[in-house]
Amino acid sequence: MAEKETPLTAVKVEALVVMKIIKHCSQTFPTTATGSIVGMDVGGTLEITNSFPFPVLEVPSESHFENAPTNPAAAAPRAKGNAAYQAEMIRMLREVNVDANNVGWYTSANMGNFVNMNVVENQFFYQKEMNERTVALVHDVSRSSQGSLSLRAFRLSPKFMTAFKENKFTSEELQKSNLRYQDIFVELPVEIHNSHLITSFIHQLQTPNIPTPTELPPSLAALESGPFVNSTILAPNYDNLTLSIDPFLEKNCDLLLDSMETHHTETNNFQYYQRSLAREQQRISAWQQKRKQENATRATLKQPLLPEDEWQRLFKLPQEPSRLDSMLNSRQVDQYARQVDSFVSATTGKMFAVKGNLLPGETTK
């Protein structure tokens, strides 16, 4: 193992591990899938060489268990029942001479909605109880279905770990520590590694040759549907002119609006707390002023003074709500905004191209 003073700079995942994670997450989609990852730390690079899924304890609908999680799979990494299972799996891997160091866990996501309390609590449990140098791999099944693999590695920042351990998420504490929603996670670059034999085999694969048409097309319809479409680079392709908005982009916009509404609700709750606190402080100030006047009168009459700290028993200041939920929601809004920004470029160009047909008064009769 590398020295703890060497910071983690990257995550290297074996291709077989990536395939196992993709298969597990795709089979359980749209429900959450979680599992453990093992490997070793080499010079600040976390090499992940194997993985295995966590068993999920399904709670019957008619059960009356207290504190039963609403999503057992999401809470599986920190479940007590999985600790023995994970230790037994690592022991078996060690017996067959496989890297058996616990380096983190993985989870599935849908449309980038991985910024939640379950992920934070799981990663906090791993960095605090298991090993400080652990990561969480997040595989977005919906994003990967668009054609590009979405596999990201995250860790909780030391600043957020300290605040979460002390459960200090009040406005005063956040200002003192300068903790922002951008400081919740630290993302590490992910590299997918193949063995030399697999890399050599991939380079030896030959691309099948496309037969070249020998006869000219008799009509335009034959040109659009014949072999010229696949062989000619400049063949007409009208699919690029379609105005249908990507459903992934449309769903992201809906989720972004929902997160913004949640942020608005959290802001209203905090403003209500501030108004309630201001009212109580005014009442306390008025009571203290009245008590001082009474004590001044009693002092002139040489009577015993009344206690001036009695307001602590008579008045109760409202408790400030935790700002953790608001921070997580802000980080989720940022995640949705980044996804929309990455997908909006192609659609925006098409919308500007037909601007005259979309806006009234822009077309000429």
Curated annotation (Swiss-Prot):
Pfam families per the UniProt record, alphabetical: eIF3h_C (PF19445), JAB (PF01398)
GO cellular component: eukaryotic 43S preinitiation complex; eukaryotic 48S preinitiation complex; eukaryotic translation initiation factor 3 complex
Keyword Protein biosynthesis: yes
GO terms assigned for molecular function: metallopeptidase activity; translation initiation factor activity
Domain named MPN: residues: 11-160
GO biological process: formation of cytoplasmic translation initiation complex
Keywords attached to this entry: Cytoplasm, Initiation factor, Protein biosynthesis
SMART domains: JAB_MPN (SM00232)
Cellular location(s): Cytoplasm
Oligomeric form and interacting partners: Component of the eukaryotic translation initiation factor 3 (eIF-3) complex.
Matching PANTHER family: EUKARYOTIC TRANSLATION INITIATION FACTOR 3 -RELATED
Function statement: Component of the eukaryotic translation initiation factor 3 (eIF-3) complex, which is involved in protein synthesis of a specialized repertoire of mRNAs and, together with other initiation factors, stimulates binding of mRNA and methionyl-tRNAi to the 40S ribosome. The eIF-3 complex specifically targets and initiates translation of a subset of mRNAs involved in cell proliferation.
Family: Belongs to the eIF-3 subunit H family.
Protein name, as recorded: Eukaryotic translation initiation factor 3 subunit H
Provenance organism: Aspergillus clavatus (strain ATCC 1007 / CBS 513.65 / DSM 816 / NCTC 3887 / NRRL 1 / QM 1276 / 107)
